[in-house]
From Swiss-Prot:
Annotated protein name in UniProt: Phosphopantetheine adenylyltransferase
Subcellular location: Cytoplasm
Function statement: Reversibly transfers an adenylyl group from ATP to 4'-phosphopantetheine, yielding dephospho-CoA (dPCoA) and pyrophosphate.
Any one GO BP annotation for this protein: coenzyme A biosynthetic process
Gene encoding the protein: coaD
Residues marked Transition state stabilizer (site): H17
Family the UniProt entry places it in: Belongs to the bacterial CoaD family.
Primary residence: cytoplasm
SUPFAM superfamilies to which the protein is assigned, alphabetical: Nucleotidylyl transferase
Residues annotated to bind substrate: T9, K41, L73, R87
Reactions that this protein is recorded to catalyse: (R)-4'-phosphopantetheine + ATP + H(+) = 3'-dephospho-CoA + diphosphate
Length: 165
């Protein structure tokens, strides 16, 4: 297959995200990891920080490109001339939301398909929200994220702690 987009906020990128990128990179000639500006959420890291972290973590994948985006995903997909959106499903609750989004996206742009991938078993329970929560309470997150991310998350928490004093 040709080109796919794997969108997300990646706040931060987790081992589960990495797993899906690894698998998608084996299916497609090119995978664009699209780091969303995140209109609905207040991200912990800025979009620029998230793009930089994702690039650092995914350096071993020559057919993976990391790009920021804002606005409609389907418009970004058309700009990138991608025909597939890759989405991860961890649980039934993910499926319901993703199924609705895939249907809406197909209505907007019928030429773009959505491909659902489930993470490998050891990553099914990982979410960026849970990883941040564990880190905020001083827990060890090294099993869930790349060492670079663990370090950067620790530094970000420390800087937020200093600024809130």
């Amino acid at each position: 297959m040709d080109k796919a987009i794997y969108p997300g906020t990646f706040d931060p990128i987790t081992r589960g995200h990495e797993d899906l990128v690894r698998r998608a990179s084996g299916l497609f000639r090119e995978v664009v990891v699209a780091v969303a500006a995140s209109s609905g959420k207040k991200p912990f890291f800025t979009q620029e920080e998230r793009v930089a972290m994702v690039r650092q973590v995914l350096t071993d994948y020559p057919n993976v490109k990391v790009m920021p985006f804002s606005g409609l995903l389907m418009e970004f997909a058309q700009q990138q001339q991608a025909r597939v959106i890759v989405r991860g499903l961890r649980a039934v609750s993910d499926f319901e939301y993703e199924f609705q989004m895939a249907g809406m996206n197909r209505t907007l742009y019928p030429d773009v398909e959505t491909l659902f991938l489930t993470p490998s078993e050891q990553y099914m329970f990982i979410s960026a929200t849970i990883v941040r929560e564990i880190a905020l309470f001083g827990g060890n997150i090294e099993k869930f994220v790349h060492p670079l991310i663990s370090t950067q998350l620790g530094m970000k928490i420390a800087s937020k702690d200093k600024s809130s004093r």
